[in-house]
Amino acid sequence: MFGELGVPEVLFILGIALLIFGPKKLGDLGKGLGEGVRGFKSALRDEPKKEETKA
C-alpha cells in the first residue's frame, strides 16, 4: 500500500502538512523527530548486553 508512493505523492503530502502546521511548526516537528530517533539509536547502541544464565 505505502510502497507505491512516488515523488509527486510525497510532495503533495508534505505540501498539505506545510499548510496545516505552518513552516515554523513543521521545522520544530522535524527537529524533535530527529532528536528522538538519534536518542533511540544511542540507547540501543549503549545498552549493556545481558548474559544468559544457565539453569
Swiss-Prot record:
Question: Topology relative to the membrane, per the entry?
Answer: Single-pass membrane protein
Coiled coil location: none
Q: Which domain of life is it from?
A: Bacteria
Listed GO biological process terms: protein transport by the Tat complex
* Segments passing through the bilayer: 1-21
Question: Subcellular localization, per the record?
Answer: Cell inner membrane
* Stored PANTHER family: SEC-INDEPENDENT PROTEIN TRANSLOCASE PROTEIN TATA
Family named by the database record: Belongs to the TatA/E family.
Q: Report the HAMAP family cross-referenced here.
A: TatA_E
In UniProt terms, what function does this protein have?
A: Part of the twin-arginine translocation (Tat) system that transports large folded proteins containing a characteristic twin-arginine motif in their signal peptide across membranes. TatA could form the protein-conducting channel of the Tat system.
**Assembly and binders:** Forms a complex with TatC.
Q: What is this protein called?
A: Sec-independent protein translocase protein TatA
Instruction: Look up and give the organism this protein is from.
Output: Koribacter versatilis (strain Ellin345)
